Design a protein with these regions (language model features):
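Amphipathic alpha-helical segments that mediate coupling or scaffolding at interfaces
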Residues: 30, 34, 51, 67, ...
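C-terminal, well-structured subdomains that either form a transmembrane helix-short loop-helix hairpin
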Residues: 1, 48, 52-64
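Cytosolic juxtamembrane regions of multi-pass inner-membrane proteins
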Residues: 95-138, 146, 150
């Protein structure tokens, strides 16, 4: 748009693409702009619900930092694999955040319970991992096992999503533990 605006003259006019290429370009532009907005809303909602659930800003930060790291690493993996942010890939990062906060809810709720009963941070963490760590590990591995087979799909989108989802499920699990 900027190029057409800056370089069009009375004798020569640059028009934006039409047909499939134009629609794809316009869609990509909207998706690119929507990606950051979507992540902002997702993280605001997760922050709000963590604050309500845990009643602790520290616990909220502990839950959010691994999720944000996973989002950044997922986007880096997408760049490395040559996967663009498209309408079909846009929800993947949000899904990873939703699954990741689930792991954090399991562990932090038990840890905070033990801390409120007077346990030290280290002992409360050990108790939380002993009590719910196996469940978090089982859920993470089960979710990853459900999509890891997609990696060998002849459908490129499905194979790419298999890699991304497997990565996000396992990385979020490790981040929570």
């Amino acid at each position: 748009e900027r190029f057409a605006r800056e370089n069009s003259t009375a004798d020569r006019q640059f028009l934006l693409a039409a047909g499939s290429a134009g629609i794809e370009a316009a869609t990509n532009l909207v998706v690119h702009e929507a990606n950051r907005t979507m992540l902002l809303y997702v993280y605001l909602a997760v922050t709000l619900f963590c604050l309500i659930t845990f009643r602790s800003w520290r616990a909220t930060v502990v839950a959010l930092v691994p999720l944000m790291l996973t989002s950044v690493l997922c986007e880096a993996l997408m760049v490395f694999m040559g996967i663009g942010v498209k309408v079909a890939t846009l929800p993947v990062i949000a899904l990873g955040v939703g699954i990741g906060v689930d792991y954090a809810l399991y562990l932090l709720s038990v840890q905070l319970h033990h801390q409120r009963q007077g346990m030290s941070l280290v002992d409360a963490y050990r108790q939380a991992v002993a009590f719910t760590g196996r469940v978090v590990g089982l859920v993470g591995i089960t979710l990853a096992a459900g999509v890891v087979g997609w990696i060998w799909s002849p459908i490129k989108f499905q194979a790419d999503m298999g890699i991304l989802l497997t990565f996000m499920f396992l990385w979020n699990m490790l981040g929570a533990l």
